[in-house]
Amino acid sequence: LANLGIKSKALGYTAGFTGDFIKKNLYDEGIESDFVELDGITRINVKINNNSKETEIAGLSPKITKEAEEKLIEKISKLQKDDILILSGSIPGSIERNIYKKLAEMLPEGTKIVLDTRGNLLKENLNGNFLIKPNIAELEEMFETKLSTTADIIKKCAYFLERNVKNVIVSMGGK
């Protein structure tokens, strides 16, 4: 967003030296941040791509306490009409599974939600989102079928539009 000249603020959790690295890089790029600090270190994920296959190794996340969860909810509760909230990734095990729905319900009318997640978490949180962004593998996983043509992909995206999602972007991975 900053590269497009759009002011934004990064919210979430950070911990330890990896959290400091993230905050410094955001600062260097002119992006405001307001993270909730946790004990431990922000997890490191590694992706290995050997042209025909991508392997992901996900590190362990720090524990998110109820107090830390409430601090982040408080920060998000300050969003206003016409703000955009991006909810991305999985939900850590220590946080209620319905947190995305809870956040959506507390936002003022006119706040847009961009949802970038997968599987049941995506299915359970569709109503009224401004944008969702599954990749082709996530779409195939969700519908339990291979999507070989653009027409197949468009047909499956109708499912989201029927659930009041305003925009769907399907990234094609390495294709």
Description of each model-found segment:
Residues 36-44, 65-68:
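Gly/Ser-rich phosphate-binding catalytic loop and adjacent alpha/beta segment
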Residues 48-81:
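Conserved phosphate-binding/catalytic loop of the ribokinase/pfkB sugar-kinase fold
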Residues 98-175:
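Conserved phosphate/ATP/ADP-binding segment of small-molecule kinases
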Residues 7, 82-83, 166:
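Short acidic/polar active-site loop segments enriched in Thr and Asp
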Residues 56-58, 82-90, 116, 133-138:
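Short beta-strands and strand-loop turn motifs
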Residues 1-41:
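Substrate-binding N-lobe of the ribokinase-like
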Residues 62-65, 91-95, 121-122, 141:
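Short, small-residue-enriched loops and turns at beta-alpha junctions
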Residues 12-13, 37-38, 47-49, 58, ...:
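Short beta-strand segments
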